Amino acid sequence: MLPTILSISYEHTYAYLSKYQTAYACEGKKLTIECEPGDVINLIRANYGRFSITICNDHGNVEWSVNCMFPKSLSVLNSRCAHKQSCGVLAATSMFGDPCPGTHKYLEAHYQCISAAQTSTTTNRPSPPPWVLSNGPPIFGNGSGLIHPPGIGAGAPPPPRLPTLPGVVGISGNPGLFNVPPQHTAVTHSTPSSSTTAMAGGRLKGVATSTTTTKHPAGRHDGLPPPPQLHHHHNHHGEDTASPTKPSSKLPAGGNATSPSNTRILTGVGGSGTDDGTLLTTKSSPNRTPGTAASGSVVPGNGSVVRTINNINLNSAGMSGGDDESKLFCGPTHARNLYWNMTRVGDVNVQPCPGGAAGIAKWRCVLMKRMPDSGYDEYDDDPSSTTPATSSADCLHNSSSCEPPVSMAHKVNQRLRNFEPTWHPTTPDLTQCRSLWLNNLEMRVNQRDSSLISIANDMSEVTSSKTLYGGDMLVTTKIIQTVSEKMLHDKETFPDQRQREAMIMELLHCVVKTGSNLLDESQLSSWLDLNPEDQMRVATSLLTGLEYNAFLLADTIIRERSVVQKVKNILLSVRVLETKTIQSSVVFPDSDQWPLSSDRIELPRAALIDNSEGGLVRIVFAAFDRLESILKPSYDHFDLKSSRSYVRNTAILSNDSDVNAGEIQQRLRILNSKVISASLGKGRHIQLSQPITLTLKHLKTENVTNPTCVFWNYIDHAWSANGCSLESTNRTHSVCSCNHLTNFAILMDVVDEHQHSLFTMFDGNMRIFIYISIGICVVFIVIALLTLKLFNGVFVKSARTSIYTSIYLCLLAIELLFLLGIEQTETSIFCGFITIFLHCAILSGTAWFCYEAFHSYSTLTSDELLLEVDQTPKVNCYYLLSYGLSLSVVAISLVIDPSTYTQNDYCVLMEANALFYATFVMPVLVFFVAAIGYTFLSWIIMCRKSRTGLKTKEHTRLASVRFDIRCSFVFLLLLSAVWCSAYFYLRGAKMDDDTADVYGYCFICFNTLLGLYIFVFHCIQNEKIRREYRKYVRQHAWLPKCLRCSKTSISSGIVTGNGPTAGTLCSVSTSKKPKLPIGVSEEAHDDPQQQQQTPVPITEDAIMGASSDCELNEAQQRRTLKSGLMTGTLQAPPQTLGGHVVLERGSTLRSTGHASPTSSAGSTHLIFAHKQQQQQQQQGPLGESYYHQPDYYSWKQPPTGTGGLKTPREYYNNTGAAASSPQQAHEVFYWTQKPNSGQHGKKKRGAGGVPASPSGSLHSRTAAASQVLFYPSYKKTKAGQPTGYPQYAEALDPPLATGNAAAYYQQQQQLRRQQLHLQQQQQQQQQLSSDEEQVEQHAHLLQLQRRAGSQQQLPAPPPHMAQYQQEFMQRQYRNKQSNCDLGMGDAYYNQGSVGGADGGPVYEEILSNRNSDVQHYEVGDFDVDEVYNNSVGTGVFNNMRAAVAAGGSRYGGGSLSGGSVSSRSQQQQLKKQQQQQSLAQQRSARRCTADDDDDEDEEEDEEATAAEQLHDSVCDEDEEEDESDLEDDAHGLPPQSDERMRRLMAMQDEDFKRRFQRQLRKHGAPLDYGALPPGAGPQPEHNGAVFGVSGGVGEGSKRGAFRQQQQALNAKSPGGRLAVNDLFGHGNSGPPLPPANQTPAQKRQQLQKLSPQSTTSSSSHTSHSNPNPHPHQLTHPHPHQHPPHHQQRHLSAMLDENNTVRCYLEPLAK
């Protein structure tokens, strides 16, 4: 196939090889045209009129029209000169007419002299320039006139690299349309030995040709010759075909080994008069096999050859019709007053310049990627396209790949759908087009006798009114520079200084005006006629020309002067200053000189003086408008020297990947400020001693970022940042500092308007991962905070807990602010607030980490190692330092520069300036270094302590602190990794760093690990929290029933042993039996052998699990406790019957009890009044442990035996009538007292005997088994809420199975009483007179009624225990190891409701008010019995009894006023006797002041006296604590608590007494011991204060009275001990405590029932009571006594998670 030449004939080709000439003739003159002999004239174009102001204008008239044209000028000339050797035509209106009257016209003719033999085919169509074709050897070997098509030939050797070819590559290397080898024939036989072959005029490369046969294609319907074919059909049967080459066998194996794998299309335009842009389609796959179609190989199919160029099928047989073929051609269009015809992709259309300008215009057609529409899949198959069938003959060439070639061609066709032919650049290249008048000015300026002022003036006038082309811009700037150079020599010819200055100033004015005209908007198209490189060159020439002319004037001025030239687009200022007058920096421009911009440049005084010359400083300032639209950043485009393209989205076609996978996403940078210039006379562009300061206003404030201070480099014609730095920036302005002078501006990145958040730099996967990571971390932080809040009962309010709460809050704020900030734009005000708060949160978080490390260090170096309590002053100091310092630093930063939070690219970062490093980086580093330093010091201290001999509890606490420090250190390192990775990722993404993604994924991983670490090591690892999680989840209604435990379940546990044997769990339970406490089972009742089993040690988790209401597995077998006394350990005997808790020496406490679903976390509330006869059991051979079953209905039971009481032997052997009664579930409570040695001494601070928490972790409680906490607390119940408990009935079910009729009757009676009690309670609530009464009623416990005759005698101990009685009591007294027992005197508890009901439990569940848990009492520390051990005797007790009988009883140092009050003399006598006999007063080294109020009345003064005496005894005890520590260590007992705890307990005791006495006096209660609080009446000795009452009778007797009563009790029942019931119900007569829980209506009824007779009767009865009552009388009120209803005091207790019994005494009514 032989193509023809586009749009021209061969004759035209020869004509263009001739010289191109132009002739002019002014109006009235003759135009003569002549050619050489043998040649004739060939006219190209002609015009009679005026296109230029400079031609035929000797006088410089600028008023003539330059758009004057006679349309038939060419026809007139052709009639006179066409095809002639010479001719002459008169340029006159008589010949051509007058197209523009008043304008002096001229005749212009463009012609060529061609051979006379070619005149027959010459046409008037404009022809391409002469270098389209070039001379060379014969094109056809056989002499035919056909031109060989491009791309056919043996192929030249591959060049070392892909060259940048000119716009039209000529033959034999010369410019031309085709690149044909010199030795070329019509038919060639070659193998693809070269991967680079010129095609389509050298535009498409990378084609290795195979054997081809050329044919001339059919003519086109539009009359134009068809374009040369890029791909050729293979004719297997043509006559000229010679041995076709098979690619599968002939291709060399390494033919394409050097080809890269990708293909990049680079498009551009030429410059400097030639088209040196290229369309590069090189680089094919290096992994081609010989059996596959290589680049440019022949793919057989349907009898046609499908030639591919790097998998791009530009033209194939599969394409049919004009639509497919038109994709390879750019359509015709009009641009710059020229018509551009259809042009093939890769070719350059060339034609003459428009409007009378000399030169040629060029425009390239390229194949560019089409922007895909939304929802359009660019690789979807065309539904209309069909895949051609493959013939069997085609498969013979490659049977293994018969179908793939067709599929590959189809795929290539689909890829071509995404590309379209496009004219590039957007406007034609008119760099070579020059107006004729500018050529005339250029010639004039080079003449010696020309007037420079006239030339400059003509240039300024023409540029302001005429349209310029690209070449005109080059000529104009060249003239400006030439004028300045000539004026530099010509000024010496003017002897007068003023004349010289005037001439140069006029020249400068014309030059500035010309420059402003070039920058005007009307000349924008002229700038676009230039390629980007030429634009930069012209701009540089304009700037230097203006500067040269300005300094020409500055050098002429010899005195101080300032000249300002202000035009539309340029402000120029020339200043000549004397150095002596320079007092400060010089600023340009003035505010009133340049209103177009607020830009400002400031030159320091020192820099000016250093560059002075002759005492004068010459400065040139310039400010430009619209220059920023020309001086574009060059590195935004591709390499201009090789491609000259500014197309950012370049298509990359890969052989192995999709097209869009290789799209280049480059950063788009713009010049975002006006250009401002400054130069000094000496050296002009020199380094300055001091930098200058520039303030530049941003032209665009939205969607721009990353400002950079740059200057224009004259050498490279590009912007450079060397020597300039950004000082500060905000949304509208930037401040720069540079150490040299030139033209300055601001470069900024453009952010996509549709995606302007931080996530625009994330790919899809990373964005999802960041969301997930932050979400996980936030969830776990919230869980940690909720754990601290919901399960606050588990934790001690310590400094460590407060620190970690603050850390969690700071981390939560940081995560949320980061997530919110990365979605915001960097230009919004809200973004600034996010950055501010994030700054503060990070500083606070790092500060809290530092304080946490410091707290661990201080714990190890102080006495806080063994006692972790709330340290409010220290925590407050932490709060002040953390948040105070953080807010102060942020405030200082805001005051210094508020814009630092709004000028950065992202909302989560500050701008990296000096303020950022001073207010953010430095404080964070200081806190982190301090935290690491304190952690290192803590490790050193722990290593030293581990080598020293410490007590067991100290080692335990040290291990806990060591674990906390390890966790904190890992936490700190993990948090540092999170923040560092986030910072480096953001910075890297900002600079398009390749490592940004690595940091991004590191941030995702570390942030996720941070959340998991918080949850695991700060929540899950703490066994207390795990237990609370189980309880919290299982006790809520939103869970299925299968996951929740029964609300009626009973949890219990027993801890026995000391030391290694501590923590032994001993219990037995069977499947679905009565829910008895641990230690009770039916096997234990029936099988004595089972009771002899050895205890089974169990871990802390199992112990706590057994005590949880959800952990009791009723189907499991539990063992009972082995009998006997272990060495050094007191243990329960085998007679452990009826659920109870055994407390042993040195052990912790576990208690049975129902855990209500409404119980607060970490507590087990004990509920009393289960139906069971009262029992008192002595456990073990020493009878150390007791248990009690408070029985609400025991007074209803018929008496059995002697008075319904068992003998001591019956109790001990579990015989008698009670033995046959069913054993029912019940709940009791005990509390421990701190063991103490016999001798006391002063002990050191901080050595309080608080064993370590089982977990020993972060949230360890300081309360332990040896600590008893007293709370005045109550629970508000809802109206109509039942108070019965279903476990009562459940506990009675098993006896029914045995057929016990008595048990069944007992159960029925109990159920009826409960129902009656519930009904009466509801009626009482309905009778409430107001809402206030109802609230008060709900806020108190149930009403209790004292019933006479319900108390039973204390059972005597077994006979074999008598010999151990004295030793046991003495040891128990010395060690203060006692049990609070409810076995005696339950008349105080077994009382009915207010209405006299018989049913209902005695107690409701009591919820502790956690806010009131502020008083911690150590019962063991309240050891006042040692003070009165030898001083208080029987006489004191008798005197106290006599005083009580006389009506002058004192309680706690205060007056108990009933019917009468003791006199002042009796009080003084008792006080004096007490002080004389007190052993504590003799050993007292100091006195403790009481916290009593001096403003109390006379009765309160007496209370203060007793309180002071009590404090004396406590203070005396401090001196002996040091000695007690030694004995504590010897016995393995925990040491005593510190002095503060004892003082607090004493003050609470005194406060209780005062309130109680006021209540008695308020109601006028008689002196009845039954009405006294616990310990007020005569009682036997009890070892330890209980329920906030220290015991004692009156002032002179405190603990001695207990000893007296204990001796009296021992006389009746050896080994008997007074229980709590006796403490609260003293004596056998007198009214009970006033009912504090009565409603106002009930109180009024009670007051109405009171009468003087009853009061007198009570007083009389009390006065005749026996001063030394029998123990039986102490616990039994008179059968006929009917006490009035006074305030009653109720007692309850709960066991917390730290084995601490919390006893609750009902608060007194106000």
UniProtKB/Swiss-Prot annotation:
Polar residues composition bias: residue spans: 185-198, 256-265, 1638-1650
CDD domains referenced in this protein's UniProt entry, alphabetically: 7tmB2_CELSR_Adhesion_IV (cd15441), Gal_Rha_Lectin_dCirl (cd22830)
Bias kind Basic residues: ranges: 1673-1689
MF-aspect GO terms: carbohydrate binding; G protein-coupled receptor activity; mechanoreceptor activity
Keyword Transferase carried by entry: no
Residues in GAIN-B domain copies: 561-754
Modified residues (Phosphoserine): 1156, 1253, 1260, 1329-1330
Subcellular location: Cell membrane
Residue ranges with Low complexity bias: 275-285, 295-304, 384-394, 1458-1483, 1651-1672
Positions annotated with a glycan in the UniProt record: 142, 256, 302, 341, 398, 655, 703, 730
Membrane association type: Multi-pass membrane protein
Post-translational modification: Proteolytically cleaved into 2 subunits, an extracellular subunit and a seven-transmembrane subunit.
Superkingdom assignment: Eukaryota
Disulfide bridge positions per record: 709-736, 724-738
Acidic residues composition bias: residue spans: 1491-1505, 1515-1528
Regions that span the bilayer: 768-788, 802-822, 829-849, 876-896, 921-941, 969-989, 1000-1020
GO term, biological process aspect, one: cell surface receptor signaling pathway
Location of region: Disordered: 183-304, 376-400, 1234-1259, 1452-1540, 1568-1690
Pfam families registered for this protein in UniProt: 7tm_2 (PF00002), GAIN (PF16489), GPS (PF01825), SUEL_Lectin (PF02140)
Residues marked Cleavage (site): 741-742
Gene Ontology cellular component list: plasma membrane
Domain SUEL-type lectin: 25-114
Quaternary context: Forms a heterodimer, consisting of a large extracellular region non-covalently linked to a seven-transmembrane moiety.
Family under the similarity heading: Belongs to the G-protein coupled receptor 2 family. LN-TM7 subfamily.
Entry protein name: Latrophilin Cirl
